Amino acid sequence: MGDNYYNDKLNAEKLFKVYDTKIMRIKQYLKAEIDYVRSSINADKTVIELGAGYGRIIKELAPFCKSVIGIDISENNVVLAKEYLKILPNADVIKMDVHNITVKSTFDIVLCLQNGISSMGMTPEDIKNIMKLLNFGGHAFFSTYSAKFWDCRLEWFEEQAANGLLGEIDTENTGDGVIVCKDGFRATTKSPEEFEKLGRMTGYPLKIVEVDNSSLFLVISKE
C-alpha cells in the first residue's frame, strides 16, 4: 500500500506530525538528506520535488535555488503546502500524480527523497519518464533507507503508531527491511542492487552513495 495510503490516511496535519519526531537520530537523518542534495544546488538551479507532501523539504531548499516546485497526489497536502510556503515567492506545490506527470517545464534537479521511490511505488517506466524532466547536465536524486538504519527506522514507525498516525505495527510480519502495520500499511525499501538496476536501465551515468549511515542515494546524471 503506497500512494493511496498517503493520499487517503497519512496526509496534511498527520504527515506534519510524522516529522515532528522526538527521536534525535531521525532528526539527524532528515537533515542529512537535505544537506546532501543542497550541496548540488545553487542560486541558478531549478528544482522539482516528487511527493512533496506539505513542503517540508521545499522550505529548506527554496532559499538556495532559483525556483522549486513540488508535486503531490494529496489535495490536502497541497492546500497545507501553499500555506506553509506562502512567504517563499520561488516555491510552490501542485496536485499531480507521479505516475502521470504533466509538467511541461524541465529542471536542473529532480528530487525524490525519504524513500519516495518505494512509498509511491515507482516503476521503471516512471523512472524513465522522470528523467525527461531533467535538463541536460542535470541530476536526479532518489533516496531510500540504508539497511544500517533499520533499528532507528523501526523506532520511528513505532512512534508514529503510538501517536495514532499509523496502525499498530504487525511485529510478526515486520522485518528484513519491511514494516507492516495492522491497518494494511506496508513500507518497503530499495537495495543497492535494485538501485543499480534502475539506474542502469536509464542509460545515464549513475552513482550510489550512502549518507549518514541512514540514507542510500541513487543519483542519475543526464549527460
Question: Where in this protein do the model-derived segments appear?
Answer:
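A short acidic, Gly/Pro-enriched loop at the edge of an enzyme's catalytic core
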Residues: 102-110
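Class I SAM-dependent methyltransferase "Motif I" SAM/SAH-binding loop
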Residues: 51-53
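A short glycine-rich, Lys/Arg-flanked "PGG" loop and its adjoining helix->strand segment in the class I
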Residues: 124-136
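SAM-dependent methyltransferase
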Residues: 141-198, 207-208
